[in-house]
A protein has these predicted regions:
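Short internal beta-strands
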Residues: 39-44, 76-79
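Short, glycine-rich nucleotide/cofactor-binding loops
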Residues: 8-20, 54-55
Length: 119
């Protein structure tokens, strides 16, 4: 079976539950079918706020974010968005990967064969 590479793009805070549910479904499928995946979530614009650990704790998203990260899902965060909203990298979960520009990360991943999903 071919390994699927998927990048989920999120730029609106209200879409986090849908993205995290989609991730959960893909990870469950991986367990059930032994299919291999490379998964990344790219957060930019206002969606970066939910990757601040304190905010995630207060919105009850923390477990739904930590579980996929522990299973190898990459959470990439746009540095341009962090700068725009004056968010320090230190406020993010330690597993977050800060990328210079979200749009470039999306383009690079798509050129590497990642499927683009924007719930």
């Amino acid at each position: 079976m071919v390994k699927l590479k998927i990048i989920f793009h999120i730029d609106e805070p209200n879409n986090w539950p849908m993205v995290l549910e989609s991730l959960k479904n893909v990870l469950n499928n991986a367990k059930e079918t032994n299919r291999k995946y490379e998964l990344e979530v790219l957060a930019n614009s206002m969606a970066v706020f939910q990757l601040r650990e304190l905010i995630a704790r207060n919105t009850h998203l923390i477990d739904k974010i930590i579980e996929p990260a522990e299973q190898g899902v990459v959470f990439a965060v746009c540095n341009n968005s962090l700068n725009k909203f004056n968010i320090s990298k230190d406020e993010l979960f330690s597993f977050c990967k800060v990328v210079p520009a979200g749009i470039i990360e999306l383009a690079e991943k798509q050129s590497e064969g990642y499927l683009y999903i924007k719930p």
